[in-house]
Amino acid sequence: MASLLGAYPWTEGLECPALEAELSDGLSPPAVPRPSGDKSSESRIRRPMNAFMVWAKDERKRLAVQNPDLHNAELSKMLGKSWKALTLSQKRPYVDEAERLRLQHMQDYPNYKYRPRRKKQGKRLCKRVDPGFLLSSLSRDQNTLPEKNGIGRGEKEDRGEYSPGATLPGLHSCYREGAAAAPGSVDTYPYGLPTPPEMSPLDALEPEQTFFSSSCQEEHGHPHHLPHLPGPPYSPEFTPSPLHCSHPLGSLALGQSPGVSMMSSVSGCPPSPAYYSHATYHPLHPNLQAHLGQLSPPPEHPGFDTLDQLSQVELLGDMDRNEFDQYLNTPGHPDSAAGVGTLTGHVPLSQGTPTGPTETSLISVLADATATYYNSYSVS
């Protein structure tokens, strides 16, 4: 390459001064610049070549002849490396030629302005989609691609606002079906989903809360389901039923509350005890506290472990033992019935005397069973 440049140096004598003199004398018409208003003609005007383009114009042809199997991109890479390898002295003639072409271009096209071609932008795959449209499309089909913004806005204008029912379909139906399938469970609302505005967090606890019966016999019939209830089964339809309680110590579960004492449960049968589970509870109705007092959480074991906290003197201090002896000696009420009531925790009503004075009432049976249990508990 250096030998070629040395043999054919670029000199100013190659600029054809005779031709320039003819053009300056006006013997031949000069090049008429194209009108600026013609956009089609202006779009065809090429930029003046720089020094690299002047050098690569002939060098590319030479490399293409030597390497016919190479792609044009590969040839461009080779030309770039070769141009960087040249020294400043070797690049000088090409730089001068590029400057001459630039000045000539300015004379030919004085109103020329470089306007780069706009690259054809492909359609963007990921467009910004309305968030509400994405939420509403979840209920239709999760496999379909999101539509354009215009369609999403059109649907939003047609529907007005995005209702939570359309965004989260079937939440209430899922809750109802779950509650119907598992009546012993209250927390059937699906986790991980936001609560709809029209649905309060406490509304999930109100339905199906009348699953406890007013009679204690249904509670005794299903003892293995009740301890697993997670929520507070208080019922708004709280009605006292004083003569259905057959459990001798059923009312003692409320003995820990400050409003209801232990002895009051023995002296009189309270209303039917509302069962509350062994998990933490949240009272929903404040009017129940007026009847039951402020309830404390129940003990861990459903047995009689709470009796360990009370001494025998506190339990029997206010009782008349002669009254219990009178009831124990009553005919028709054998000791076997008391023993069975002590072991099972139930005293059948049929074993008590059906007729007689007030000592045959349910209060007497409860007091009799309580005293018998305390005596056997102290002996053991």
Curated annotation (Swiss-Prot):
| A Pfam family annotated for this UniProt entry | Sox17_18_mid
Q: Which InterPro entries match?
A: HMG_box_dom (IPR009071), HMG_box_dom_sf (IPR036910), Sox7/17/18_central (IPR033392), Sox_C (IPR021934), SRY-related_HMG-box_TF-like (IPR050140)
**Where is this gene product found?**
Nucleus; Cytoplasm
The record, for PROSITE patterns, names: HMG_BOX_2, SOX_C
Q: Which GO terms describe its molecular function?
A: DNA-binding transcription factor activity; DNA-binding transcription factor activity, RNA polymerase II-specific; sequence-specific DNA binding; transcription cis-regulatory region binding
Residues forming the Sox C-terminal domain are 260-380
| Its job | Binds to and activates the CDH5 promoter, hence plays a role in the transcriptional regulation of genes expressed in the hemogenic endothelium and blocks further differentiation into blood precursors. May be required for the survival of both hematopoietic and endothelial precursors during specification. May play a role in skeletal myogenesis and up-regulate the expression of muscle markers, such as PAX3/PAX7 and Meox1. Competes with GATA4 for binding and activation of the FGF3 promoter. Represses Wnt/beta-catenin-stimulated transcription.
Its quaternary organisation is: Interacts with CTNNB1/beta-catenin; this interaction may lead to the proteasomal degradation of active CTNNB1 and thus inhibition of Wnt/beta-catenin-stimulated transcription.
Can you name this protein?
A: Transcription factor SOX-7
- Name the lineage: Eukaryota, Metazoa, Chordata, Craniata, Vertebrata
The encoding gene is Sox7
